[in-house]
């Protein structure tokens, strides 16, 4: 499970997800990737489930890059606890994802295998995504044609 080794502050406010991704919005390492189409929080368990789905499908060929990291703690109070008496303790970690962000990349496998592996991974994620290739995405992050 992904999480930071140490953080300066244990608890964070929820924050807002405004606008599009300005960083990590193109396929940098592999040939194909998963691009987010809507904002959301991706938990470390969801990232791991998607990684396992990709790894199982591509078997020993190819390489997988995870381009997001869960660095935001989400707190939760115990069940049947009265309101008040402070903020709950950190329960799990999430990565904040904005539209246009490329979250996973796959390289070193043929087109059909890569697309099927990424399709399986998309089903593990809680937001709408699409499969993009290196040719589809310019350096600016704008998608020319849907794959």
From Swiss-Prot:
SUPFAM superfamilies: Ribosomal protein L16p/L10e. One of its GO terms (cellular component) is cytosolic large ribosomal subunit. Keywords: Ribonucleoprotein, Ribosomal protein, RNA-binding, rRNA-binding, tRNA-binding. One of its GO terms (biological process) is translation. One of its GO terms (molecular function) is tRNA binding. Belongs to the universal ribosomal protein uL16 family. Part of the 50S ribosomal subunit. Binds 23S rRNA and is also seen to make contacts with the A and possibly P site tRNAs. This is Large ribosomal subunit protein uL16. The gene is rplP.
